[in-house]
Regions:
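Alpha-helical promoter-recognition and RNA polymerase-docking modules of transcription initiation factors
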Residues: 1-77
């Protein structure tokens, strides 16, 4: 079920990959981080699984971008 939902939001992950650079991250790392982020989002908001609107995209995009920006800040501080 998680993998099916991830396929729906995978485009957001790949767009972020093109916009941001994280040292030593490969495509698989981005996908893994995206799945982990989606899992955490659905744990916090299980109602998003049943919703028919596209609210999950908005929530995921915000959560994932913030996660990537945190990783970039961490990378830059080292």
């Amino acid at each position: 079920m998680l993998e099916k939902k991830y396929q729906e939001v995978k485009g957001i992950v790949h767009k972020c990959r093109k916009e941001y650079y994280l040292h030593l991250w490969e495509v698989e790392d981005w996908d893994q981080e995206g799945m982990l982020c989606l899992y955490e989002l659905l744990e916090e908001h299980p109602e998003l699984m049943e919703r028919k609107d596209k609210k999950i995209y908005t929530y995921f995009k915000t959560k994932f971008r913030n996660r990537i920006l945190d990783a970039i800040r961490k990378q830059e501080s080292q």
